[in-house]
From Swiss-Prot:
One of its GO terms (cellular component) is extracellular region. This is U4-theraphotoxin-Hhn1a. Monomer. The keyword Manganese does not apply. Keywords: Disulfide bond, Neurotoxin, Postsynaptic neurotoxin, Secreted, Signal, Toxin. SUPFAM superfamilies: omega toxin-like (SSF57059). One of its GO terms (molecular function) is toxin activity. It comes from Cyriopagopus hainanus (Chinese bird spider). Its main location: secreted. Residues 1-22 form the signal peptide. Disulfide bonds join C52-C66, C56-C77, C71-C82.
Length: 85
């Protein structure tokens, strides 16, 4: 009886550890996939590019000096566009 109980508990522990390891591996493999589009980052990139170029055009139309908006977070404004530094 004790041997059966120990065998069942051992199998249950192995199953739990195997399932946890498989879930971690799946999560890591999804993060490591190359070519998988990240729509949130793409949207941020488009917003930054749009924000920099539009702000400059608006200031030119108002007969004011073109003061480029400062792009933050490793970006800089160049040719009226935010570019990654």
């Amino acid at each position: 009886m004790k041997v059966t109980l120990i065998a069942i508990l051992t199998c249950a522990a192995v199953l739990v550890l195997h399932t946890t390891a498989a879930e971690e591996f799946e999560a890591e493999s999804q993060l490591m996939e190359v070519g998988m589009p990240d729509t949130e980052l793409a949207a941020v990139d488009e917003e930054r590019l749009f924000e920099c170029s539009v702000s400059c055009e608006i200031e030119k139309e108002g007969n004011k000096d073109c003061k480029k908006k400062k792009c933050k977070g490793g970006w800089k404004c160049k040719f009226n566009m935010c570019v990654k530094v």
